[in-house]
Amino acid sequence: MKDRYILAFETSCDETSVAVLKNDDELLSNVIASQIESHKRFGGVVPEVASRHHVEVITACIEEALAEAGITEEDVTAVAVTYGPGLVGALLVGLSAAKAFAWAHGLPLIPVNHMAGHLMAAQSVEPLEFPLLALLVSGGHTELVYVSEAGDYKIVGETRDDAVGEAYDKVGRVMGLTYPAGREIDELAHQGQDIYDFPRAMIKEDNLEFSFSGLKSAFINLHHNAEQKGESLSTEDLCASFQAAVLDILMAKTKKALEKYPVKTLVVAGGVAANKGLRERLAAEVTDVKVIIPPLRLCGDNAGMIAYASVSEWNKENFAGWNLNAKPSLAFDTME
């Protein structure tokens, strides 16, 4: 049988990425052009800046991805692209490039949900067994997803306010840490003690919903009040206390979901899945199901994960027309 090569595009936020997947599971290339340095001075992603950067580098990313994969444009079988959720301007750059490539070469266009990409990045570790449960944690999302089969995603719980990664970045900014702050907070947390009593919202409620706005506000108030009084707080202890509260919330809801949905596999994915503290808690506390976490290189935004997620869409012949548009608020269905 002739080999299949999927060329995948990811431009939902501040990473321009193009990847090539051979058949179902051989990632030949995964080129990522990061914009973090451009956004650091703003303390967050500036949509207009992100879009301009995507335009500047996407052609070079395509060329590099094909070269690294050792194939030519004529070898590509299909084109996959993130069409949401994300920043509308950023999404449109990737969509335009993907549609142009597919149209020029007469190839099918595969639409991929960005969060499905994060989830299916776990396929790079080992073949996934369904049904499974996934905890998706990133800068824009915190949700528990039940996956009955590849491509069938249902939200069973999600945040009511801030995403967990967003909370990390906001408290990081208060402490004067560099954006994005997640990795630095994680490192500092391992050097400090959990001595500050931060709230764990909804942790005892019998649902699968998350809330991080109260925790974020409590942190900011503590830090602000200490500054007003001229008191010095240990950054390491602040980080340790904040992270302990975050992980308590994530673990409580995840374990509750595993009780409600008896599955054999838990996938933990998204940018926050790179968090060392979270990985340690999962290893220690979730021992009765298989826990699969994508490798660090596939935790952040990348086109490799979009390629993995596109396989199930290819198998279902779920192809898009040339009128495919960006859907910045695209979401999985909610479990009824």
From Swiss-Prot:
GO molecular function (one): iron ion binding
Annotated keywords: Acyltransferase, Cytoplasm, Iron, Metal-binding, Transferase, tRNA processing
Annotated binding of substrate, by residue: 136-140, 169, 182, 186, 275
GO cellular component: cytoplasm
EC number from the UniProt entry: 2.3.1.234
Residues engaged in binding Fe cation: 114, 118, 301
Gene Ontology terms describing biological process: tRNA threonylcarbamoyladenosine modification
Signal peptide residues on this chain, from the entry's feature table: none
A Pfam family reported for this protein in Swiss-Prot or TrEMBL: TsaD
Alphabetized PANTHER family for the sequence: TRNA N6-ADENOSINE THREONYLCARBAMOYLTRANSFERASE, TRNA N6-ADENOSINE THREONYLCARBAMOYLTRANSFERASE, MITOCHONDRIAL
Function, in words: Required for the formation of a threonylcarbamoyl group on adenosine at position 37 (t(6)A37) in tRNAs that read codons beginning with adenine. Is involved in the transfer of the threonylcarbamoyl moiety of threonylcarbamoyl-AMP (TC-AMP) to the N6 group of A37, together with TsaE and TsaB. TsaD likely plays a direct catalytic role in this reaction.
Identification of the protein by name: tRNA N6-adenosine threonylcarbamoyltransferase
Gene: tsaD
